């Protein structure tokens, strides 16, 4: 059929890894060839906020959010593979981006 690329993102790497392993299991059961999961670089967003609402500019607090991501390529996807991916119940914290890559 065609090549499907899945890009998964989450703030918690443990939840992300559980979702990735569920996807890999489902795809392997259908007999499709899979490449990955490939860990992509973690994006770190840092925010600096004043601690006091009025004075003390020198007193600041820093927060950060880490966004972990993985990439999975399904090389020979069949209609069975697509059906099993649609039926998967993944964690709500995981953002899944699906792209169809032409042959």
Swiss-Prot record:
Keyword annotations of the record: Ribonucleoprotein, Ribosomal protein
SMART domains, per database record: Ribosomal_S10
SUPFAM superfamilies according to UniProt: Ribosomal protein S10 (SSF54999)
Keyword Membrane among UniProt keywords: no
UniProt GO BP: translation
PROSITE patterns the UniProt entry points to: RIBOSOMAL_S10
Keyword Ribonucleoprotein tagged: yes
InterPro entries, A to Z: Ribosomal_uS10 (IPR001848), Ribosomal_uS10_CS (IPR018268), Ribosomal_uS10_dom (IPR027486), Ribosomal_uS10_dom_sf (IPR036838)
Pfam families: Ribosomal_S10
Family per record: Belongs to the universal ribosomal protein uS10 family.
Subunit structure: Part of the 30S ribosomal subunit.
Protein name in UniProt: Small ribosomal subunit protein uS10
Organism: Nitratiruptor sp. (strain SB155-2)
Classification lineage: Bacteria, Pseudomonadati, Campylobacterota, Epsilonproteobacteria, Nautiliales
């Amino acid at each position: 059929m065609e090549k499907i690329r899945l890009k998964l993102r989450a703030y918690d790497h443990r939840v992300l890894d559980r979702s990735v392993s569920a996807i890999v299991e489902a795809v392997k059961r259908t007999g499709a060839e899979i490449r990955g999961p490939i860990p992509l670089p973690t994006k770190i967003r840092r925010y600096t906020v004043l601690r006091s609402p009025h004075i003390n500019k020198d007193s600041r607090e820093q927060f950060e959010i880490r966004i972990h991501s993985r990439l999975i390529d399904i090389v020979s996807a069949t209609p069975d593979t697509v059906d099993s991916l649609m039926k998967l119940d993944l964690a709500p914290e995981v953002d899944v981006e699906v792209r169809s890559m032409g042959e």
